[in-house]
Amino acid sequence: MSTSPYGGRLPNGLGLSVEPRPGAGLVSVALTVAVGGDADPAGLHGTAHLVEHLMFPRAAASDGPDGGHVARVEGAGGVCNAETHRDHTVFHTTVPAGMLTEVLEWEARRLLTFAPTESVLRTETSVIAEEIRGAAAAGGVWEAALAALHPGSRDAFGTAAELAGATTADVDAFFRRHYRPDAMVLSVVGEVDPDRAAASVERFFAGLPTGPAPAPAPAPGSTPAPAPARTAAPATIRTAPLPSPVSGAVLGHPLPDPVLDRSGHLAHVVLAETLGRTRLPRLTRRDPRIVSARVTCGYHGQWLGGAAPDLLLAQFATVPGAGPRAAADGWREVLTELAERPADPAEHRRALNALLLACHRRADSLTARSVSLGRTALLFPTAPGPDALPGDLARVTPAEVSAAARALLSGPCSVTELTAPTTPTGIGENR
């Protein structure tokens, strides 16, 4: 068995990356497509999410006892799932290594036979409507900050009312336009022979039609909005309040573009880890108005999980009546501390070590590794591969983290108040 990694493209443009892990006993296959919610047609917000769902065809009578795609994978002792982001969609499957050929055939089959029926379409739009309601109930703070800082941007979940009007012709046109082999990367990681895997991919995927390229129109919100004219204070953008179990506020900041300014982006990642690990816990101990505080970097906490625009969010729970002012005061306080005085070597090293551990855990997971290879190839084609990330992080200096804190202090910030329900008086009283 060859143990050398393989990378290349099929004649139809499909990207392929194969990374052997001898002795793993498993293999993970990720299909990453360079389309997400930013490409949703006008009036059909959520089409990319809907197509993702429709890529998991349900069992039909003609399928026989093995059932639909999910049933086949689970029957082989594997698991599969998918995620729709703003700028890409990824499908990942992990199975015993001996099932790789079958999984590649199934993956190609659902691309070649994509033809959802009206009944399946209506079922999946109902499922997505429930997901949208669940996301709204979970808060929607990331989406609120994104819309404030990057006008025109929308989440990848969708809008239930718009999806209710989607037709099979709509989703078929979207699929034909965007699910082209030259806009996809297939990543295979695990106990696999790269030469045999490449031969199987050629066998099953060579017949994918190339199709017309999408019109070169910029997606809404794909680039940051022009910075407002700088005044004495940075721009603060208030969003509509959001309901929450506890009162508080969420403050959002745009992150540097990870392609155009990779070092600046990673400095913000280290800043977020430093704040969350040491500075915010100290703040909650000394400020009685703040109950808890946390900071996340990247799309729902997945740093380098997407290209620009992306966000850093600071979420605060406060005592009743403190309002968003307490959160804003505390946030500026901890940022100013780091902006004026860099972290000492021990604090900086603890933050770096935590991030490096997360990198190594991702690399250890076959699924995470296969997803990372595809995501890097599509979203960050000029950047070094995922193996360069630990070294790039380790080179971030305390001075660069301080510069990142200064950038947040001087740049735009969204503020979303979290409002907790009030308990009516008299409930539970004995009269």
Q: What are the residue ranges of the model-derived segments?
A:
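Short acidic/His-enriched helical or mixed secondary-structure segments at domain edges of catalytic enzymes
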Residues: V127-W142, A232, R238-P241, V246, ...
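Non-catalytic, conformational "gating/processing" segments within enzyme and secreted inhibitor domains
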Residues: T168-F204, P412-S414
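A structural supersecondary motif
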Residues: E74, V250-P254, A272-T318
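Acidic/histidine-enriched segments that form metal/cofactor-coordinating
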Residues: V33, A60-D63, G68-F174, D195, ...
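C-terminal regions of mature proteins
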Residues: T3, V185-S187, R349-R431
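M16/MPP (pitrilysin/insulinase) zinc-metallopeptidase core fold and M16-derived inactive scaffolds
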Residues: G23, S28-T94, S153, T274-S292
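Proteolytic maturation boundary segments
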Residues: M1-V18, D193-A240, D392, P398-R431
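His/Glu-based metal-binding/catalytic segments typifying zinc-dependent metallopeptidases
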Residues: R21, A30-T32, A213-R282, L304
